[in-house]
A protein has these predicted regions:
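Glycine-rich phosphate/pyrophosphate-handling loop used in enzymes and phosphotransfer proteins
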Residues: 1-211
């Protein structure tokens, strides 16, 4: 670890004192990223899961969740290449994790990124290695939302993931040029329309095969 990184982490600890991502309470110097009692409250993703996005599916006979199944069928029907390889999930979106994600995204709890990144590496280290990833590119926010929120939680997570894996992170390779509606409020068709033309990819991204 370089001296600059050490100084950055020390400053980050002063500005954003470590808090438990579940209860949001301050962590003692002897606690690492999360209170031990709070760790038990998180519901980890278990099989069976969607082979494409990693979300829990109802039965093992279902390879894909409903959204991914429709996407795969559309790609086959219209002979479009699906550049998306695979996604992984850490926790089921229920219980304590809902409040955690809300604070991470909207309440300036960017320090939660360290917990999510370490959990991801612990759970999927072998999968990450097999993917042979060239660069981590965080999903960009529209400049208007970025100004309002003050930070991009995807960048916080990407930076922490980069630090823990050694995979470089690159900002600016993809720009968000359309201020889209929140996807959670939209159905499958509306989501596709909402994201149409939302991003601009820079030519410099072509030097990377696995992102």
């Amino acid at each position: 670890m370089g001296r600059f990184t050490e100084i950055y982490r020390e400053l980050l600890g002063v500005i954003f004192p470590p808090r438990c991502p579940v209860c949001d309470g301050l962590l003692s110097p002897y606690e690492h990223l999360i209170h031990s009692d709070c760790q038990k409250k998180l519901i980890e993703i278990k099989q069976p899961v969607c082979l494409r996005c990693g979300k829990t599916v109802i039965a093992e006979r279902h390879e894909y969740c409903d959204d991914c199944r429709r996407t795969v069928e559309d790609c086959r029907k219209y002979r479009k290449k699906d550049f998306y390889r695979q996604g992984k999930a850490l926790f089921g979106y229920k219980g304590s994790i809902k409040e955690t994600m809300y604070r991470f995204k909207y309440a300036n709890r960017r320090e939660y990124a360290a917990f999510f990144a370490e959990t991801a590496v612990d759970k999927y280290a072998e999968w990450i290695r097999q993917c042979d990833i060239d660069v981590i590119v965080p999903v960009p926010m529209h400049k208007r939302k970025r100004r309002e929120r003050g930070y991009n939680q995807a960048e916080c997570f990407g930076w922490q993931l980069s630090q823990k894996t050694g995979i470089p992170m690159a900002r600016g390779l993809v720009r968000r040029v359309k201020n889209t509606e929140p996807l959670k409020q939209l159905g499958y068709v509306e989501r596709k329309k909402n994201l149409d033309g939302a991003f601009q990819v820079l030519d410099s991204i072509v030097k990377y095969d696995h992102i």
